[in-house]
Each structure stands twice: as structure tokens, then as C-alpha cells.
From Swiss-Prot:
Catalyzes the synthesis of alpha-ribazole-5'-phosphate from nicotinate mononucleotide (NAMN) and 5,6-dimethylbenzimidazole (DMB). It comes from the Bacteria. GO terms for molecular function: nicotinate-nucleotide-dimethylbenzimidazole phosphoribosyltransferase activity. This is Nicotinate-nucleotide--dimethylbenzimidazole phosphoribosyltransferase. It comes from Sinorhizobium sp. Belongs to the CobT family.
Length: 338
């Protein structure tokens, strides 16, 4: 906690003083790219990704220790009947991750990615956002701090993912609170909500945002009122990565909602981040556009678990490999353009 005694103060200070990109590393990467055995721009976004890696790591583009971090939380709003699955599924899926049986496990193995799963007090769901704040400021700040530990073991590329029954309801509420519009524009099926369940989900988002409307101009206050533990932890992880010069790939609709809170607090807060994919959740593309980002993949996925970010990590690894491993014109004895 800060000297002032307010739990969010340290995070506000951090958001005001975010480190920027490394200009010298970016120049060096561009100079090397100009000498590689290919026409300028021929690798398209792979070149942009290599430059992004250099700028935010401060060194030549390389990915040696990529990590997928999944944050799991439960939500009191599920009491409103917003999802066909019980909250117990969150803990069951955490066990599935540990046993290696989930989709993210297979993607991590196939792409040689590390995996960490963070269980965020699953036995204590957050407050029902249609009736009260999800978290106190103290609890929200503590969970952000816990999320910052995601990179403690060392990583050079962080993929942000989540698991939590009810958290697409939370994401929709965050987006409605941040950007306005209607609940229908931001609410999607999530884990399969349709019919009356979908109607209850829309109603819950409307009610939650109306209840907290007078307190949503402050992004961190919005997060504690409408968010959840995995939202706070993902925000903390993204901030820690910025400070430690670790580039980030953000996963789907829920992870993007967490990132959007940081962007609202500081317009440059996500400059070290890529969006891994656009999900099948209807509001995700709209949320990405609000961030001014372009997703790497569009596969119609809407699973969460960091799966889209993990698949995108394969592209980022390939970009780094091309930049570092390709021969220059001089090395290969290939004539450059005159």
C-alpha cells in the first residue's frame, strides 16, 4: 500500500510513469531487417512484430521463454442465471489444466510455451455486480499485485488468458461502462447462453452499469465495481510486464476487457501489447477497434484459456526467428537491389 494509505495509489503512480519503447533497439532492428535476403516489407506483419519485440525488450528480437498465464476467478453475478454452467466448472477446469487435458495444454505443447495457472480464491466469488461492487479497493489492489507475480519466474513473452464462469458477463459490463452503447451490443453467448439465459445476461449487464453509473469515470474504480479477480490480476500482469520489458499478447474478449481498463487510465498503457486474435464473441472486434489494435488471428474461437494468444505466440516466435536467423545479402552472396 502507498504512503497515502489508498490501495490504488501505487497503481495510479505506475500508470502515470510507464516506461516507453527503446528507440536504439528499434533502429538496430530496422537496420538489420533492411539487410536480410528479402524485398523490403515482404514479410509483412512479421517484420512489424520483430520491430515491436525489439522496441519493448530493448534488444534484438528473440523469444526464448514464452509463457501463457491463465487467471481463474468466480463471479457472484452468476446467481442471476447468466450462464448455463455452474460456477463449480471454474475449479474443475483449473484441475483439467493441471492434468494437461485442456485445449490450452495441447497448444502450449505444440508451440513450446510455458504455462502457469493462477487460482484466485475460487471458493469466494466476487460480489454480484447487479447488487454491489465486485471487490473492495483493497481486495482489487491486492489481486492486481498478485497478478504482477505472473512474470516472477522470468519470461520474455507473456500471453494473457483467463477462466471463469460468468466472466463474459463481466467483460460486457466493463465495455458498456467504458464505451457506452447498449448491453445488447456487448453481450454475447459466452459459454453458450441463449434464449432466456441470454436475456437475463443482457438484463444483468444493464442493471450493473446503471447501479454503478456514478462511479465509472475512474477506470480503476470501474474495475473494482464491475470486474473480477481475474480482471484485476490480468491488469496487474500487463502492468508488470511493461515495467520489466516483457511484450504481451492479449487473448480474447475477457482479457481484452481487462486491458481496456488500463488503456482508459493511460492511452499508451497497451503499446507493449498485441491482440492475439479476434474471438467469435460478438463484442470482441468492437472492443479491439476501441483500442486501435489489429488482431493477429481470426479463427472463430471463443474458448478463452489464453488459446488465441498462445496460437499467436507461434507467429511472434516465427517473426523473431526470421529476424535473427535469416542471412543478410552479404552473408548469402545474394545481390541486393541497386
Amino acid at each position: 500500500m502507498s504512503a497515502s494509505g489508498l490501495p490504488f495509489d501505487d497503481f495510479r503512480e505506475l500508470l502515470r510513469n510507464l516506461p516507453g519503447p527503446d528507440a536504439a533497439a528499434l533502429v538496430a532492428a530496422r537496420e538489420r531487417d533492411a539487410q536480410l535476403t528479402k524485398p523490403p516489407g515482404a514479410l509483412g506483419r512479421l517484420e512489424e512484430i520483430a520491430f515491436w519485440l525489439a522496441a519493448w525488450t530493448g534488444k534484438a528480437p528473440v523469444v526464448n521463454r514464452p509463457l501463457v498465464a491463465i487467471f481463474a476467478g468466480n463471479h457472484g453475478v452468476t446467481r442471476q442465471g447468466v450462464t448455463p454452467f455452474p460456477s463449480s466448472v471454474t475449479a474443475q477446469m483449473v484441475e483439467n489444466f493441471a492434468a494437461g487435458g485442456a485445449a490450452i495444454n495441447q497448444i502450449c505443447v505444440s508451440h513450446d510455451l510455458g504455462l502457469k495457472v493462477f487460482d484466485l480464491a475460487l471458493e469466494y466469488p466476487t460480489g454480484d455486480i447487479t447488487e454491489e461492487a465486485a471487490l473492495s479497493e483493497r481486495d482489487c489492489a491486492a489481486t492486481m499485485a498478485f497478478g504482477m507475480e505472473a512474470i516472477a519466474g522470468g519470461t520474455d513473452l507473456l500471453c494473457i488468458g483467463e477462466m471463469g464462469i460468468g466472466n463474459t458477463t463481466i467483460a460486457a459490463a466493463i465495455n458498456l461502462g467504458l464505451y457506452g452503447g447498449t448491453a445488447e451490443e456487448w453481450v454475447g453467448p459466452g459459454t453458450g447462453s441463449e434464449g432466456e439465459v441470454l436475456k437475463r445476461k443482457i438484463a444483468a449487464v444493464e442493471k450493473a452499469v446503471a447501479l454503478h453509473r456514478d462511479h465509472l469515470s475512474d477506470p480503476l474504480e470501474l474495475m473494482r465495481r464491475l470486474g473480477g479477480r481475474e480482471i484485476a490480476a490480468m491488469a496487474g500482469a500487463i502492468l508488470a510486464a511493461r515495467v520489466q520489458k516483457v511484450p504481451v499478447i492479449i487473448d480474447g474478449y475477457v482479457a481484452t476487457a481487462a486491458a481496456s481498463i488500463l488503456k482508459a487510465a493511460n492511452p499508451s498503457a497497451l503499446d507493449h501489447c498485441l491482440i492475439g486474435h479476434v474471438s467469435g464473441e460478438p463484442g470482441h472486434l468492437r472492443a479491439i477497434e476501441k483500442l486501435g489494435k489489429t488482431p493477429l488471428l481470426a479463427l472463430g474461437m471463443r474458448l478463452g484459456e489464453g488459446t488465441g494468444a498462445a496460437l499467436a505466440a507461434g507467429i511472434v516466435k516465427a517473426a523473431a526467428a526470421c529476424h535473427s536467423g535469416m542471412a543478410t545479402f552479404a552473408q548469402a552472396g545474394v545481390s541486393n537491389k541497386e
